[in-house]
Amino acid sequence: MNLVKIEKKWQKIWEQNEVFKVKEILNKIKRYILPMFPYPSGKAHVGHVRNYTICDVIARFERSQGHNVLHAMGWDAFGLPAENAAMQNNTYPNSWVSSNVDVMRQQLKAIGLSYDWSREIITCSSQYYVHEQRFFLEMLKKGLVYQKESLVNWDPIDQTVLANEQVINGKGWRSGAIIEYRNLKQWFIKITNYADALLKGLDSLKGWPESVKTMQKKWIGQSTGININFQLKGIEASVKVFSTRPETLFGASFIALSYNHNLVQQYVNTTPETQKFIDKCSNVGTSNVNIDKMKIAVLTNLKVIHPLNSSIELPVILSNFVLMDYGTGALFGCPAHDERDHEIAKLLKLNIKQVITSTERNIDVLKEAYVGDGIMINSFHLNGLTTTEARQKVINELQHKNIGQQVTNYKLKDWGISRQRFWGCPIPIIHCKSCGAVPVPYEDLPVILPEHGVEFTGKGNPLDNHHSWKYVKCPKCHLDAVRETDTFDTFFESSWYFARFCNPTSDDMVDAKAAKYWLPVDQYIGGIEHAVMHLLYARFITRVMYDLKYIDIQEPFTSLITQGMVLHRTYQDKSNNWLYPNEVEVDSNGQLRCKADLQYVTVGKLEKMSKSKKNVVDLELVLKLYGADVARMFVLSDTPPEKDLEWSTEGIEGCYKFIQKLYNFALKLKNINLTDNKIDKVLLSKTHKTIKNVTQDIISCRLNKAIARLRELYNLIFKMSELTVQIKESFLILIRLFNPFIPHLSEEIWSLLSGRGEMLVELPWPKYEEKYIHEEEHITIAIQINGKLRSLYNCLIDTPEHDVQSAILKLEQVKKHIGDKEVRKCIFVPNKLINIII
């Protein structure tokens, strides 16, 4: 059996017959199945195999249901790696990207993925991004785009600005560099205009994992509270403070300002201590990450008057946990009932006053903050009220005195889309000294990147130094002007590509007719790491496209699967150099050694496959040794799609052996003339039950369970004492059920045995009959003695423990192993095993 040869044969047949090419058929139910498209980094890896195979199984299954299936692939091709490769290899980024796309396309075809390749898109093509430039200008017209100077996340290695979502634990998401903070003029899109809609829209996404929705809710960060005016002592000015817990107002010990609050420059006396604090915040920023690492604060010369009791004065401090771009950039601190405030009070030796008591336990607020609800104390006229009652009473009182206003705030910030790099979509703006920022006229689009004379030095943006491209005439006054040299954040391209797949050759950004048929995406698949970047941006851009009448949907993805990662152990030699798995071998004692010098290697923990640690598996080698169907089956077996998968040679070899068994059994059936029409009721029941369960498993994306059920049916077929017509029919049903998982071999076996001319991929899904499933079904239970498998026992499904135990203790093989020893206990797992402890 030459699996690779079989796979190439069927891939050619599918391509020649355009099996997966689709068009809109209005009277046919559509299904749009889509994986997150990849960055063409060079080669596909086994992580890609898992993601795309999960998607492919669903697409093939939906096709077998008679649905019209759109399943497409493209390339998220802009980004820094191409620019870095251009610098290292002295080439143009497009050459590097094109070469990588050619390699990865062939790899994905070799896996047998059912894509409509006629819809392939690549985001670095001007035919793609011309629409993005027009869309940007449309948003500019609608007031959704603006430019301002702002404190930005600066990646010193990649030398570009990163969005907040791209800063992970204070480091650049791609380079890993510690982020710096700089004031730069940037372009922003007003995603905050859609904060409430994006938050409420999550409730409609019933097919999304709760974990992803929770992450987006936290990122949007809605909080309802009140802005309270505190009068500064001795100064004709006030500070507006945002609070979500106004009931704790009488427990306030301080007012905290952001280091860059406007009152700081106006009224705070500059001392060496305050200047040192301001300089530190300016250098390291006040991101949530930095706040979590270390909370710092400093007292100032200012005091405020308590709004509900003028005899109370509170000190004003500066602290890094107050963010100028959230709320008002000021808050009051109640150390007894807020953990963060408690830390600051301890640091500055400020008063800690309890104003809420628990009804359930004793609390000591000097030791730790009590953040729960309870009954108000030490709060004058609020004493005795519940926290809920007190909150509303304080809000009413503050509003009545015109010193408070209820507001809703969001942590979500506007999307900064400017990037100081070459390999991205040019921002279609021209800067003129007389006219300001002028949009490039539509007839002059696309603004294309220069293809010659670009110098990639690794420092700054090459577009700044490309004079023939940069210096142009103003479209309005025709005087000298300069192009915008920043390019779009690459998340812009991936925020609408799913709509382009509906018709990738349309003259419009989105073909309205095709989009009305295909959108939304019915099943989207990708990593959970995109929860608050790509997935949030795509939801936002979809709503903008809806408002601008491009499409008639408000949510892009009906259902979402976030597949787990593929893991592999890491290996290091005696010099702590990383080793590839194929550089390691097992010696006769079961120890791992380096093939090169036979020295022992250090085995690390299971980690996500990465080129830097060399714990990657060569996909081309896997396909060459085992074939695509084996790889597909392995990445789907044993582990649910949403869980991480450990790559193992033993596991993939086990799948290879099973597939060999399938093929050999098919050859056996082909070479025998079957005439026996005897019906085995157990096999009949098992076959129909398998159809039913596998169908439901695929619908619920329990693909590992589906494969387990298929293997169970095969085991029953294989164990039948004599071959019959019924066995062949059950085996052919098994092969049809296996088709989405191992499409090449299943097609080959079907063509060998069915005697029919159709391809499996064109046949409807098998149907079960409930009447057959009610027959009593036998199962095989494993018999273990002290945990070791000793025998097997066939019985009816759901046989009670007492009956199983009584029967197996009478078996000669079991009695032989027990001998004269006492049976201490039996561990019974229904329908699975019984373990006799002696």
UniProtKB/Swiss-Prot annotation:
Pfam families membership: Anticodon_1 (PF08264), tRNA-synt_1 (PF00133), tRNA-synt_1_2 (PF13603), tRNA-synt_1g (PF09334)
Catalytic activity of the protein: tRNA(Leu) + L-leucine + ATP = L-leucyl-tRNA(Leu) + AMP + diphosphate
Protein name stated in the entry: Leucine--tRNA ligase
Similarity field: Belongs to the class-I aminoacyl-tRNA synthetase family.
UniProt short sequence motif 'HIGH' region, positions renumbered to this chain: 38-48
InterPro entries: aa-tRNA-synth_Ia (IPR002300), Leu-tRNA-ligase (IPR002302), Leu_tRNA-synth_edit (IPR025709), M/V/L/I-tRNA-synth_anticd-bd (IPR013155), Methionyl/Leucyl_tRNA_Synth (IPR015413), Rossmann-like_a/b/a_fold (IPR014729), tRNAsynth_Ia_anticodon-bd (IPR009080), Val/Leu/Ile-tRNA-synth_edit (IPR009008)
One GO term describing the cellular component: cytoplasm
A Gene Ontology biological process term: leucyl-tRNA aminoacylation
HAMAP family (UniProt xref): Leu_tRNA_synth_B
Assigned keywords, A-Z: Aminoacyl-tRNA synthetase, ATP-binding, Cytoplasm, Ligase, Nucleotide-binding, Protein biosynthesis
EC number(s) stated in the UniProt entry for this protein: 6.1.1.4
PANTHER family given in the database record: LEUCINE--TRNA LIGASE, MITOCHONDRIAL, LEUCYL-TRNA SYNTHETASE
Subcellular location: Cytoplasm
Major localization listed first in the record, in broad terms: cytoplasm
Gene Ontology MF annotations: aminoacyl-tRNA deacylase activity; ATP binding; leucine-tRNA ligase activity
Disulfide bonds: none
Motif ('KMSKS' region): 608-612
Chain sites annotated for binding ATP: K611
